[in-house]
């Protein structure tokens, strides 16, 4: 019986994808749930597994092809591998007697995921020398990065005098989507950015005082992001328009707080969402952000992790950014930009003191948020971070 291989549901509002990599070819035997191919959507890369045992009877859509949800991309002849197993057994045994066994199976380039193959090629690595830790011994991106880290210190410098000076690389669907959405945001929203600065002295002191006890009790490190998430929620409650969006001729005010946290990955920027962050404690916020960030870097985020979000936070400070104007993530109406904390001279009670200061920025849609509201939003965050006890006491 022939069983169709179809493009699965890709999540909310996603109707099209690109075939990134086939791991099987026509005639190959497959088992139920064995990896067949990877499909790249505008947000994540998804695996498509075999629905039954059999052999690949047809591949109708090749790598690089755009496909729609529910579209047939191939078929499996169910049970075909089982019918031929008996006849193949004897020849397999004969080959086992006459052919020497390799200590380490070769890894063909066509078994590597596109992102992994790219790393291997760019760093001139032999995949046969990389131990795979993924499913069925597959080489993961982490395996390649670990190999790079262990070899870079001893590897001789490579002259690039004879290499091509220009490399043309096809944009991934994720990169195309990032480019399109950011440009759409600029073309649609009336984006305005307002700035403020925060004295980080008290929140740094509070973190230093309790970070070891916090980690021991909650099994997660106490960072600054949880303070900013909680402060942001209080500011959103004070200024509801920042948590709203425009839908046609209507303004939609949201009475829940799903906070998107921007994460930079090798494939591009993604914004996983911390759901109902207002109902979480500091430890749960830190754990959730840590899990989502790890999944983002490993390419394991689901569509649900990336969908929705009422407001976003982007922390360019981790890369050393001192000041920036973040771009709104549509259909949201605002995004908070955090930056590098550095010691600066400030006037405190008429005296010059050295304090750890951070610039913060709010980019917002001026169609729905007035200037007064934007400034008040940042002032509220400033007040809470400079007096973190108010966050803890819900003041």
Swiss-Prot record:
One Pfam family named in its UniProt record: Biotin_lipoyl
Modification type N6-lipoyllysine: residues: 43
Keywords, alphabetical: Acyltransferase, Lipoyl, Transferase, Tricarboxylic acid cycle
Cofactor: binding details: Binds 1 lipoyl cofactor covalently.
GO molecular function: dihydrolipoyllysine-residue succinyltransferase activity
Signal sequence extent: none
Active-site residue list: 366, 370
Subunit-level organization: Forms a 24-polypeptide structural core with octahedral symmetry. Part of the 2-oxoglutarate dehydrogenase (OGDH) complex composed of E1 (2-oxoglutarate dehydrogenase), E2 (dihydrolipoamide succinyltransferase) and E3 (dihydrolipoamide dehydrogenase); the complex contains multiple copies of the three enzymatic components (E1, E2 and E3).
Name of the protein: Dihydrolipoyllysine-residue succinyltransferase component of 2-oxoglutarate dehydrogenase complex
Species whose genome carries this gene: Rickettsia conorii (strain ATCC VR-613 / Malish 7)
């Amino acid at each position: 019986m022939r069983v169709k291989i179809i493009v699965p549901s890709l999540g909310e509002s996603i109707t099209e994808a690109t075939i990134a990599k086939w791991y099987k070819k026509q005639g190959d035997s497959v088992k139920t749930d064995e990896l067949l191919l990877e499909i790249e959507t505008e947000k994540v890369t998804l695996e498509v597994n075999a629905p039954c045992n059999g052999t690949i009877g047809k591949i109708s859509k090749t790598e690089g092809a755009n496909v729609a949800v529910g579209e047939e991309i191939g078929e499996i002849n169910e049970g075909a591998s089982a019918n031929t197993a008996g006849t193949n057994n004897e020849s397999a045994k004969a080959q086992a007697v006459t052919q020497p066994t390799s200590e380490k199976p070769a890894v063909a380039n066509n078994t590597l995921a596109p992102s992994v193959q790219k790393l291997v090629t760019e760093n001139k690595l032999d995949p046969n020398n990389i131990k795979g830790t993924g499913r069925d011994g597959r080489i993961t991106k982490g395996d390649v990065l670990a190999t790079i880290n262990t070899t870079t210190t001893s590897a001789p410098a490579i002259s690039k005098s004879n290499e091509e000076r220009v490399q043309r690389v096809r944009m991934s669907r994720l990169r195309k989507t990032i480019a399109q959405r950011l440009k759409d945001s600029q073309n649609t929203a009336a984006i305005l950015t307002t700035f403020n600065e925060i004295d980080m002295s008290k929140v740094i002191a509070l973190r230093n005082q309790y970070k070891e006890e916090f980690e021991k009790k909650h099994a997660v490190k106490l960072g600054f992001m949880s303070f900013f998430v909680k402060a942001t929620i209080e500011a959103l409650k004070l200024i509801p328009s920042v948590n709203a969006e425009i839908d046609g001729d209507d303004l939609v005010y949201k009475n829940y707080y799903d906070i998107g946290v921007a994460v930079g990955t090798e494939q591009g920027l993604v914004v996983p969402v911390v759901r109902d962050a207002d109902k979480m404690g500091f430890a749960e916020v830190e754990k959730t952000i840590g899990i989502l960030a790890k999944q983002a870097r490993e390419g394991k985020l689901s569509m649900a992790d990336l969908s929705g979000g009422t407001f976003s936070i982007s922390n360019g400070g981790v890369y050393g950014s001192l000041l920036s104007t973040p771009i709104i993530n549509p259909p949201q109406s605002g995004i908070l930009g955090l930056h590098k904390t550095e010691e600066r001279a400030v006037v405190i009670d008429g005296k010059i003191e050295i304090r750890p200061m951070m610039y913060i920025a709010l980019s917002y849609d001026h169609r729905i948020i007035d200037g007064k509201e934007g400034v008040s939003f940042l002032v509220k965050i400033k007040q809470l971070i400079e007096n973190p006890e108010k966050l803890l006491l819900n003041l």
